[in-house]
C-alpha cells in the first residue's frame, strides 16, 4: 500500500509466525513487470525443470547483487580462470550491470546474469546451489512484496563463504542452523572457528568445512625483514 512520498507499507508474516508491517521506499521492482517475469519464469521452469536441473547451475553473488569485491567475487574469479570450460559452463555471477563493480567482471560476460532479468528469475529457481558471501535474501529484490519466488529461494542449498570471521561475531540468531537465515554449508577459516560453528551454531563438521576465505588467495606479503 502506498504510504506517500515515495514509500510503501505492507503486512507480512515473520518466520516465527508473527504478523508484522514493513515500511520502505518504493523500488523499481515493485512494478507489475516484475510479477510478469515471475509468472513467465515459473512457467518455463515447470515445463523444462528436468533439463534445467541437469545443467547443475550455480549462482554466485554478493550483497544486494551490486558488488564484486568479497569472497563471492574471488570464488567466481577463481572458477573462471582455473576450471575447464566444461566445469565452469554453468557457473554464473549475478550482479546489476549498472553497479560500478560490474567493470571488474565484465570480461566474463558470458557468465554474468543481469540482476532481476527474466534469466535471473528463472535461474534462481533452476539453480542447484547458491554460493555467496551473504544470505539468500541478497539474491533477489530486497524486501519485495508478495512474491512467487521468494519462498522458493529459502529452500535452495547455499554454500556460505562468509564476509568476516564468525569466531569474532555473534551470528547464531541469524546464521545458526536454527536461526532466521540458516545455511546449508558454512565455510570456516580454521579449526578454532570450525569448533565454534559446530558448538554454537549447530552445524556438523561436514557442513562447516575448513576452506579459508577465497579473498585471502590474493593477499600479498609485503612485510620486510629487518
Label each residue range with its predicted role:
Residues 48, 57-220:
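Active-site and donor-binding regions of nucleotide-sugar-utilizing enzymes
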Residues 221-226:
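A short helix/loop element that forms part of the nucleotide-sugar donor recognition site in Leloir-type
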Residues 1-57:
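Basic, ligand-binding patches in group-transfer machinery
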Amino acid at each position: 500500500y502506498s504510504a506517500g512520498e515515495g514509500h510503501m507499507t505492507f503486512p507480512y508474516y515473520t518466520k516465527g509466525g508473527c504478523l508484522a508491517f514493513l515500511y520502505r521506499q518504493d523500488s523499481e521492482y515493485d512494478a507489475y513487470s516484475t510479477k510478469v517475469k515471475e509468472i513467465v519464469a515459473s512457467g518455463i521452469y515447470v515445463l523444462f525443470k528436468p533439463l534445467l536441473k541437469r545443467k547443475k547451475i550455480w549462482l554466485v553473488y554478493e550483497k544486494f547483487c551490486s558488488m564484486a569485491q568479497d569472497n563471492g567475487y574471488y570464488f567466481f574469479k577463481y572458477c573462471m580462470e582455473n576450471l575447464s570450460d566444461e566445469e565452469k559452463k554453468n557457473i554464473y555471477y549475478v550482479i546489476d550491470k549498472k553497479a560500478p563493480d560490474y567493470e571488474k567482471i565484465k570480461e566474463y560476460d558470458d557468465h554474468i546474469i543481469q540482476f532481476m532479468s527474466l534469466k535471473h528469475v528463472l535461474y534462481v529457481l533452476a539453480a542447484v546451489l547458491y554460493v555467496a558471501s551473504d544470505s539468500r535474501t541478497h539474491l533477489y529484490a530486497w524486501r519485495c512484496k508478495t512474491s512467487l519466488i521468494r519462498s522458493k529461494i529459502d529452500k535452495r542449498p547455499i554454500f556460505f563463504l562468509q564476509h568476516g570471521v564468525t569466531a569474532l561475531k555473534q551470528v547464531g540468531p541469524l546464521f545458526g542452523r536454527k536461526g532466521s537465515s540458516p545455511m546449508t554449508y558454512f565455510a570456516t577459516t580454521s579449526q578454532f572457528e570450525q569448533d565454534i560453528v559446530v558448538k554454537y551454531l549447530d552445524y556438523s563438521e561436514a557442513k562447516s568445512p575448513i576452506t579459508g576465505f577465497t579473498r585471502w588467495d590474493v593477499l600479498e606479503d609485503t612485510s620486510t625483514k629487518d
